[in-house]
Amino acid sequence: MKKILMTIVWILLLQNFHAQSQTDAVPADQIEGFTNTGWKSLNDNVIKMIGTDWMLITAGNIGNYNMMTASWGGLGWLWEKPVAFIFVRPQRYTHEFTEQEEYFTLTFFEETYRKILLNMGSVSGRDFNKMKDSGLSPLATTHGSVAFKEAKIIIECKKIYAANLQQEQFTDKELTQKIYPSGDFHTMYVGEIVNVWKK
């Protein structure tokens, strides 16, 4: 009888612990310190966010990833989905990761991180450990991609289209001479926005 009572007590304790841990746990689509607001919350000035404030494009997993600063891209609506589109040159180390991975993130920071973004865009992760002195703290997202705790906005995207820009498709021929004198045309990636986290 004593053993039966002890077993019942243990079962009740375990059930209570499980219920409490479920209550305390961060939901699967949440990141500690951030709120998953969804794409409809993106009412910021996107041209300013990307074009002048800059962003970090990151691809890979928490054990092996690379990131680069970018100021070309956009957000919009395509194929009945909320999307982000980004451009990565083939010689960039990040290109290897965006080619291989199913997901990538775009992270946006306060102005105080400008110097870090400048550094992330001027050195290659192929030759240097960009994270070493960056002061950034990587974190894993819902789908296993990488973002940073210091970000103010994290956008997680599922890659749904990739294509290399083609010289013959440019209607403004001066652009190819000005932007691509070496012929290193960007790869364009379209990603479905699957998560948006804000502080």
What does each model-found stretch correspond to?
Residues 1-22:
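Bacterial Sec-dependent N-terminal signal peptides
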Residues 21-199:
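Active-site-proximal mixed secondary-structure blocks
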